[in-house]
């Protein structure tokens, strides 16, 4: 908790000094073909008007797909579908995600303006190989020694954007993975930019909350 507090404060200091321009937040998430559970689809009204719980049925080990994406206050990357059976080790993460997707999108989106890359502390992200590659190709990034570990409450994708996408793409079960991918892609493109901006702009406030809570997590 002390390390998380220290790193949150350090990032706040860097932001106040203008050292982290145009933050780009990234993350991976697994989606499956089952219907997501939320307050709307997990409850029914009985004849007497009382609300009762209805459990959405789920199969064991449903078909799923891993996706990667990045967001910034002014835009979003392509939604990248990781091929079935592919493990995103350091080599594949660099070649299939950072080199093939992140850099081309960021160069086009920012058009020469400075930007800062964020990723979590997953093994393929924090490896020496990946950190060296990022250092050589992306001028500004939060290294594994700067980002607070185990902090999904600080990543806009984790605390907001993925939930938005799931709530809109997975309200009903998908018959196939192809159908799921189609819905995810459609809803990803339709998320209003103002919602992505709000999530990204919430990052600083959450850092301040971590500091106020002496490293505690933010709801």
Functional labels for PLM-detected ranges:
Residues 5, 62-64, 90-95, 99, ...:
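Generic preference for well-ordered alpha-helical elements
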């Amino acid at each position: 908790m002390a390390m998380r507090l220290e790193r949150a404060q350090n990032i706040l200091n860097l932001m106040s000094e203008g050292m982290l321009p145009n933050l780009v937040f990234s993350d991976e998430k697994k989606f499956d073909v089952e219907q997501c559970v939320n307050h709307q689809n997990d409850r029914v009204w009985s004849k007497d008007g009382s609300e009762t719980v209805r459990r959405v049925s789920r199969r064991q080990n449903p078909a799923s797909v891993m996706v990667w994406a990045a967001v910034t206050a002014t835009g979003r990357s392509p939604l990248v579908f990781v091929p079935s059976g592919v493990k995103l080790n350091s080599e594949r993460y660099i070649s299939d995600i950072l080199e093939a997707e992140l850099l081309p999108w960021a160069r086009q989106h920012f058009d020469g303006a400075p930007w800062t890359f964020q990723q979590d502390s997953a093994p393929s992200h924090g490896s020496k190989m990946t950190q060296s590659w990022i250092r050589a190709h992306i001028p500004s990034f939060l290294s594994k020694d700067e980002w607070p570990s185990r902090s999904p409450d600080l990543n806009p994708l984790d605390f907001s954007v993925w939930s938005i996408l799931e709530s809109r793409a997975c309200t009903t079960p998908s018959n196939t993975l192809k159908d799921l991918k189609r819905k995810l892609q459609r809803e990803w493109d339709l998320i209003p930019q103002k919602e992505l901006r709000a999530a990204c702009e919430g990052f600083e406030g959450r850092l301040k909350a971590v500091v106020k809570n002496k490293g505690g997590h933010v709801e």
